Amino acid sequence: MLNRKDQRLRRSKQTRVRIALQKVARLTVFRSNLHIYASVISDDGSKVLASASTAEKEVRARLGAAGKGGNTEAAALIGKRIAERAKAAGIESVAFDRGGFAYHGRVKALAEAAREAGLQF
């Protein structure tokens, strides 16, 4: 019997294989209880082209005194920041790799904010 983490990792492996066959950059998401992290990784998987997270000093300052990065507002902010950084790096289109997490809540907020900021997936 697999635990929740192993189940999530198993789902993410299947997704990464499908994305690798597409030969496009991928937007990966990792969600912890306290923070959310997003990275744009090159199509061959060898290089991180852009990244953003709620653990960054500027983001924590913008989120306020509590610095809460575990909510949908913080995820939306990270989605906007990752889209801006990806576009600055010359990336217009990516494949969304949710890392085995359900497309709901913070993951969905990040994805929708990235789309609104001009990143296509």
Curated annotation (Swiss-Prot):
Top-level taxon in the UniProt lineage: Bacteria
Cell inner membrane recorded as keyword: no
Pfam families cross-referenced by the UniProt entry: Ribosomal_L18p
SUPFAM superfamilies to which the protein is assigned, alphabetical: Translational machinery components (SSF53137)
GO biological process terms held by the UniProt record: translation
GO cellular component terms, A-Z: cytosolic large ribosomal subunit
Keywords: Ribonucleoprotein, Ribosomal protein, RNA-binding, rRNA-binding
GO molecular function, one term: structural constituent of ribosome
HAMAP family registered for this protein in UniProt: Ribosomal_uL18_B
Family under the similarity heading: Belongs to the universal ribosomal protein uL18 family.
Assembly: Part of the 50S ribosomal subunit; part of the 5S rRNA/L5/L18/L25 subcomplex. Contacts the 5S and 23S rRNAs.
Cited function: This is one of the proteins that bind and probably mediate the attachment of the 5S RNA into the large ribosomal subunit, where it forms part of the central protuberance.
Stated name of the protein: Large ribosomal subunit protein uL18
UniProt organism field: Methylibium petroleiphilum (strain ATCC BAA-1232 / LMG 22953 / PM1)
Lineage: Bacteria, Pseudomonadati, Pseudomonadota, Betaproteobacteria, Burkholderiales
UniProt gene name: rplR
